[in-house]
């Protein structure tokens, strides 16, 4: 989101009017706003497999060195608050890593793991880093530690509720651009 805001600021003088909408997970339920993280979890929960006591779901996120990486802790906390058991968020390029999550799996007696990307597209990271045949893929690492591993190779863009959330944000941004009443007040808007 900080990148989008930087691009917005770079080009704002080239347009008569411009607005920037909010990201998929922006609000956290404060000040009468929606809880986007809870709505996100509800949306992706339609993809969660049924799990027994010795099964876990690992949600693979991208990760970043930016401060926004802390949002993955918020997602994990909300998953826990919502009562989901043995669902863990980890990242390819940030914290928590797969290595951070594996001790939790062992502690909880997990034997079977499903890996699922929480990325818009199940692309290179999902097919290679997560589910690849190389010894350093997440699937191979988990298998080498004795876990049975399934993979779910679908991106968030395939989820109708996620697509609807993006359409809603685009409509909110349009309403803010048009100065419509009730438009989300946190949109960045610039008018000449």
Can you say where each PLM-predicted feature lies in the sequence?
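Extended amphipathic ligand-handling, pore-lining, and cofactor/metal-binding catalytic surfaces
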Residues: 1-114, 119-192
């Amino acid at each position: 989101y900080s990148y989008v805001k930087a691009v917005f600021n770079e080009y704002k003088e080239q347009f008569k009017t411009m607005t920037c909408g909010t990201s998929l997970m922006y609000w956290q339920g404060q000040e009468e706003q929606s809880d986007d993280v809870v709505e996100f979890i509800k949306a992706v929960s339609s993809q969660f497999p049924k799990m027994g006591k010795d099964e876990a779901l690992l949600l693979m996120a991208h990760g970043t060195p930016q401060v926004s990486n802390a949002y993955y802790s918020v997602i994990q906390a909300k998953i826990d608050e919502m009562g989901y058991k043995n669902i863990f968020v980890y990242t390819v390029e940030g914290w928590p890593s797969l290595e951070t999550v594996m001790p939790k799996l062992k502690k909880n007696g997990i034997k079977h793991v499903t890996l699922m990307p929480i990325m818009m597209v199940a692309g290179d990271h999902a097919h290679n880093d997560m589910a690849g045949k190389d010894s350093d893929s997440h699937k191979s690492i988990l298998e080498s530690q004795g876990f049975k591993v399934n993979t779910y190779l679908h991106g968030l863009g395939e989820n109708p509720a996620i697509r609807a959330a993006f359409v809603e944000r685009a409509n909110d941004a349009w309403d803010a651009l048009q100065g419509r009443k009730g438009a989300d007040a946190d949109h960045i808007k610039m008018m000449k």
